[in-house]
Amino acid sequence: MEKHIPVLLKESIEYLNIKENGIYVDCTLGRAGHSSEILKKLKDGKLFSIDQDETAILEGTEKLTKISNNFKILEGNFVNISAMLAMQGIFEVDGILYDLGVSSPQFDVAERGFSYRFDGPLDMRMDRANNSLTAHKIVNEYTQEELEQILWNYGDEKFARSIAKNIILSRPINTTFELVSVIKKSLPAKILKQQKHPAKKTFQALRIRVNNEMETLESSLEQSLNLLKPKGRVVVITFHSLEEKVVKNIFKKYTLDEQQFYLSNLPYEIESSKDFKLLFKKPLKPTNTEVENNNRSHSAKLWVIEKK
């Protein structure tokens, strides 16, 4: 199992602007890296951490209990953040964090089918109890056109047509390694020689489609903004352009008046009447030192929005 190092840890905790008696939500518990740092800063406050993976919940509980008891782990998908908090009697919070990096323990388990590094069944469901759509179903039942669209839209895969065509010709495809083999046959030799794994984009695309990730993120972010107290903040760490697009569009919607959309090139700022403001126009990126020490961080960006 690879060691998981939280990305942009110092910056994300700093921009959450944690008050020791505040209420905070970590929407992506994962390996509890960010949750641990939030919890250390709370005195009478409370942390709610969300995850739908049993292993993450067990490991997270063990890790956080060593720090303090001022936390509660909520099992489920962050698309239900409002309802989950309401069940705890919480209707407004001081800060919410999303680390959208793939970091859950389940990604290192071969039988979950997320990784092109391990051979396992083509599953990729985050929530196996409530989601019936698997990567196996998509790979073996969708049309070539549908597969192309998924690979292009969610993986930005230039060779989507070639991969989709070969998937159709190679059916049935039952395991991750069988799919990797088909992908490799579909790509030019020069691409196969590159450092990046040839299956990375296809696996990303399938995972996003199986778990409806972009629509889920969009819905959850909107709920989070409506949960904030005045001066409360939402901090998001993104890792690829699809996530960036969702965050950027929602943050724009909540911070810019209509006239600002059309007059954005003016040499002076127009004060927005909206209830939210961005802490910085362009997202923060990791330092060169962090990228050198943690390769996962090279594409990470930090976004922060505050309720006025």
From Swiss-Prot:
Role noted for this protein: Specifically methylates the N4 position of cytidine in position 1402 (C1402) of 16S rRNA.
Name of the gene this protein is made from: rsmH
Location(s), subcellular: Cytoplasm
Family named by the database record: Belongs to the methyltransferase superfamily. RsmH family.
The protein, known as: Ribosomal RNA small subunit methyltransferase H
GO CC annotation terms, alphabetical: cytoplasm
A GO molecular-function descriptor: rRNA (cytosine-N4-)-methyltransferase activity
UniProt keyword annotations, A-Z: Cytoplasm, Methyltransferase, rRNA processing, S-adenosyl-L-methionine, Transferase
Classification via InterPro entries: RsmH (IPR002903), SAM-dep_MeTrfase_MraW_recog (IPR023397), SAM-dependent_MTases_sf (IPR029063)
Catalytic activity: cytidine(1402) in 16S rRNA + S-adenosyl-L-methionine = N(4)-methylcytidine(1402) in 16S rRNA + S-adenosyl-L-homocysteine + H(+)
Classification via Pfam families: Methyltransf_5
Residue numbers binding S-adenosyl-L-methionine: 32-34, 51, 78, 99, 106
Disulfide bonds: none
Segments passing through the bilayer: none
Gene Ontology biological-process entries: rRNA base methylation
Keyword Isomerase part of the UniProt annotation: no
Domain of life: Bacteria
Principal subcellular localisation of the protein: cytoplasm
